[in-house]
């Protein structure tokens, strides 16, 4: 059993993009930014507990930070982890419905 304190730290924010919106409409999949050290089991447990939906599958990937220039200095954005969470049939979770 994963502690509730850890579950609150696993999910960072929803990742809103055209691809994420298409995945939600087509495959009933939500896209989230998660903690870099989060496991698939922790992500699944956090989504089920916090949003009260049934999760079918979790796919994760590490997004590498881009190099950016600030004048002559070259900086780098942080790496972060993205999770594609597929919900079971009949389950719905809408992050961007009220953003019209």
Curated annotation (Swiss-Prot):
GO terms for biological process: translation. One of its GO terms (molecular function) is structural constituent of ribosome. InterPro entries: Nucleotide-bd_a/b_plait_sf, Ribosomal_uL23-like, Ribosomal_uL23/eL15/eS24_sf, Ribosomal_uL23_CS. It comes from the Bacteria. Disulfide bonds: none annotated. Keywords: Ribonucleoprotein, Ribosomal protein, RNA-binding, rRNA-binding. Gene3D superfamilies: 3.30.70.330. GO terms for cellular component: ribonucleoprotein complex; ribosome. HAMAP family: Ribosomal_uL23_B. NCBIfam families: PRK05738.1-1 (NF004358), PRK05738.1-3 (NF004359), PRK05738.2-4 (NF004363), PRK05738.3-2 (NF004366). Part of the 50S ribosomal subunit. Contacts protein L29, and trigger factor when it is bound to the ribosome. One of the early assembly proteins it binds 23S rRNA. One of the proteins that surrounds the polypeptide exit tunnel on the outside of the ribosome. Forms the main docking site for trigger factor binding to the ribosome. Belongs to the universal ribosomal protein uL23 family. This is Large ribosomal subunit protein uL23. It comes from Yersinia pseudotuberculosis serotype I (strain IP32953). The gene is rplW.
